[in-house]
A protein has these predicted regions:
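Extracellular lectin-like interaction modules
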Residues: 1-577
């Protein structure tokens, strides 16, 4: 077998039928020395006889002309080691492929330069037999002939895959699969999927549990169908094997977006947005953690994870990531399975119900001073009781709806850690803790350095363990802000304590009971380190403190130590003799 070169010096070449050879290399070149290059058109299949070995090479170079292949390249048992298709033409169909490409068991390369249009029902590029690489140049966009009709599948073994141009940026594909149906460990690099319009109509599946790394270098990944990205949990980058290089938006229409097995690493100065629809179905799931870049100098944000009525599932978020925003519609929810740590006063904002899925989970936004933590929705344990710690530094933590009403917490601590005397932010609870049953075990809100207000706007605060409210004696305060009657109660001989600072109650009755139902459990101490005052300008409030046979300790009621408050009405105290 010998090399064969065909050079037309700018003339077109058309072969009507199959091309069969047993050559070491077949090179067809229609590049012109000047002017327009010729077209290379082959209507049939291109195959190499296996008897010639498994290291044959095909090179088609059309210069500024086009390449039009009407059949398959390679066969079921291919003898082609490498395939090169090259065109500098900028038309969307500069390289038209109507058949599959398959290489042999000898490691080689598939290199395509120029915009690609898929003319077959589906295009399958199969290099799964060896460490053959597949490379689409930066000019090599990939589009369907008819929107949503042609799909693309690429399979390699250990070979890397690089898609330098946008996929479906002009005409969307039917579906897209890159090493998702194999166990190949090759790295995968992708530019954009889609543009302002969808790039794929059906499912997009990138990588598998053995994939070395997935490098997402584009700014948009937009599909109608689901998106799945999977890489090794160990592999090339010590587990951070899904890499996002630029500010980027992932979008589907009512379908899931999942990052599986591997952690995700965001480059410095990146903003990540993932959305499956503002008010419709579609889950967002990160099986691994999300990390920023160690030593980064610019802000990295998770600008928005929006799942509509779906579920957002997250593991840990850490390493130089600042603001985090998560949004669900009323029927959606967020599940947190790992610690959330922000940098440089970064805030955490979750809209929609939130469930804690780790045995013990910490949310920490204290770095840089403090960033607010806001959960606009209910807050519960997932399936079984969990431990939750939230610390927001100098900023406020706010939970707007009920805590532990569906599945209770074992322990709950909000801004309870003194830290370096910087965890001073207030706490606002807009709903209840518990309901007909206790919502938490031991619970602490605030600490002895808290200078922000601790505000309770619910009607029930029910724990099965101790309930402590703490603040700094100089700047802190406690406020019960509800026009309806409020009940604070504990079971299990558990104390209720309001530390130093006065408590101001609203224009309704406040009941604190450490033996609800008078079960004979002897109650537990109720302690106030400050005064109990009524809110001014309204109806005077009633007060009932029932410790059963334990102690009720209070500095003053209706008097701040200097002046009468005149906003407290009936008072009933029950305690030890």
């Amino acid at each position: 077998a010998n090399d064969t070169d065909v050079n037309t010096s700018g003339g077109s070449i058309t072969i009507n039928g199959d091309v069969v050879g047993s050559l070491v290399e077949l090179d067809i070149d229609t590049t012109a020395n000047s002017g327009t290059s010729g077209t290379i058109k082959i209507t049939g299949d291109i195959t190499a006889k296996t008897g010639g070995g498994a290291d044959e090479i095909l090179v088609l170079n059309a210069g500024s002309g086009k390449i039009d292949l009407g059949g398959a390249v390679g066969a079921t048992t291919s003898a082609l080691k490498s395939v090169t298709l090259s065109s500098t033409n900028t038309a969307a169909d500069a390289v038209k492929l109507a058949g599959n490409i398959k290489t042999s068991a000898t490691a080689g390369a598939i290199d395509i330069t120029g915009p690609v249009t898929i003319a077959a029902t589906d295009l399958v590029i199969d290099a799964d037999q060896a460490a053959t690489t597949v490379t689409f140049a930066s000019t090599s966009t990939v589009n369907a002939t008819s929107a949503g009709t042609q799909g693309l599948t690429i399979n390699t073994g250990a070979g890397n895959i690089s898609m330098g141009g946008a996929i479906g940026g002009t005409t969307k594909l039917k579906d897209l699969s890159i090493n998702s149906a194999t166990t190949g460990a090759g790295d995968i690099t992708l530019a954009n999927i889609g543009s302002s319009t969808d790039g794929v109509h059906g499912a997009t599946s990138i990588g598998n549990a053995n994939t070395g790394t997935i490098n997402l270098n584009g700014s948009v990944y937009k599909t109608v169908g689901s998106q799945t990205y999977q890489a090794s949990a160990t592999g090339d980058d010590t587990g951070n094997n899904i890499n996002i290089a630029n500010t980027v938006t992932f979008t589907t229409t009512d379908t899931n977006i999942k990052f599986e097995t591997s952690d995700v690493e965001l480059a410095d100065n990146v903003s990540l947005t993932v959305t499956t629809g503002g008010s419709t179905a579609g889950d967002i799931e990160f099986e691994g953690s999300i990390h920023g870049t160690t030593g980064g100098t610019d802000a990295t944000h998770i600008a928005g994870l929006t799942s509509g009525t779906g579920t957002v599932t997250l593991n840990a978020i850490d390493t130089d990531i600042e603001d985090i925003t998560i949004t669900n519609a009323s029927a959606g929810s967020t599940i947190l399975k790992g610690n959330i740590t922000t940098a440089n006063n970064g805030v955490l904002s979750i809209t929609g119900d939130t469930k804690i899925g780790a045995d013990t989970l910490a949310i920490d936004t204290t770095a840089g001073g403090g960033g607010s933590v806001t959960i606009t929705g209910k807050l519960d344990s997932l399936t079984t009781s969990r431990n939750l710690d939230i610390n927001s530094g100098t900023a406020v933590t706010e939970i707007t709806e009920d805590i532990g009403d569906v599945v209770a917490f074992t322990t709950l601590d909000i801004n309870a850690v003194v830290g370096d005397n910087t965890n001073t932010g207030g706490v606002t609870l807009g709903g209840n803790i518990g309901g007909t049953a206790a919502g938490s075990g031991n619970t602490q809100i605030g600490n002895t350095k808290t200078t922000g207000a601790i505000t309770l706007s619910g009607t029930t605060y029910f724990t099965s363990g101790t309930l402590d409210f703490k603040s700094n004696g100089v700047g802190g305060s406690y406020v019960i802000n509800n026009a309806s009657d409020v009940t604070i109660k504990t079971t299990g001989v558990s104390t209720v304590t309001f530390g130093t600072n006065d408590l101001t109650i609203g224009n309704a009755k406040l009941t604190i009971d450490t033996d609800p139902g008078d079960t004979g459990a002897n109650g537990a101490d109720i302690t106030f380190g400050g005064n109990i005052l009524g809110a001014s300008g309204g109806v005077a409030a009633d007060l009932e403190l029932d410790a059963d046979t334990a102690d009720v300790i209070v500095l003053g009621i209706g008097h701040d130590g200097s002046n009468d408050n005149n906003e407290i009405n009936d008072v009933l105290l029950t305690g030890s003799d």
